[in-house]
Curated annotation (Swiss-Prot):
Protein name: Lysine-rich arabinogalactan protein 19
Tissue: Strongly expressed in stems, moderately expressed in flowers and roots and weakly expressed in young leaves.
Residue ranges annotated as propeptide in the record: 197-248
Extent of Basic residues compositional bias: 173-187
Gene: AGP19
Comp. bias (Low complexity): 25-37
Physiological role: Proteoglycan that seems to be implicated in diverse developmental roles such as differentiation, cell-cell recognition, embryogenesis and programmed cell death.
Membrane topology value: Lipid-anchor; GPI-anchor
Amino acid sequence: MESNSIIWSLLLASALISSFSVNAQGPAASPVTSTTTAPPPTTAAPPTTAAPPPTTTTPPVSAAQPPASPVTPPPAVTPTSPPAPKVAPVISPATPPPQPPQSPPASAPTVSPPPVSPPPAPTSPPPTPASPPPAPASPPPAPASPPPAPVSPPPVQAPSPISLPPAPAPAPTKHKRKHKHKRHHHAPAPAPIPPSPPSPPVLTDPQDTAPAPSPNTNGGNALNQLKGRAVMWLNTGLVILFLLAMTA
């Protein structure tokens, strides 16, 4: 139902748009109005075209058309027949109205560029000084002198012995005093050791002859170590008995 109403509204809108375009194109006159008015036509030509009746068949919807969104239906409009198109009056083609000469489009006034001033004339170069008088002709060159003869090297002289100045006389020796032998201070001789008194007689005790107990790293002796082992085994047995009594 909604699709039918949308199609009817589209058909009515297209009919109204076509009638408006005909009305707008009918009374349009030529752009240039002539000074002489054309005589009115004797008989009005009947309209050659008639408005076609609205078709009831719905045009097929193309597959590419998107689904119409739900819109509110337009208000009900009674289908009215479009008005007959207005036809311009028939003008005889034999006598076209005179048209005034078409004037060219008014263009913006062209602004002529300012006249370019000619470049200043180059200043005349300063007058060159008067050329000096030509120099007198150079005298003719002297004749070439012969090459000098090779000079023989002077004879080598034997080296003369170098004379040394006389050595100065030795200074008189001073009388040296002989140092006396110094006595070295030696340590005094040690005092004599007095003889020690005789030692008392040694008494043999049977306890002294007994072997000493073997040392223990824990700070005790072998007897204490044996006693500790017995205590350890006793404690282990008591713990086992206690556990058996708890589980029974």
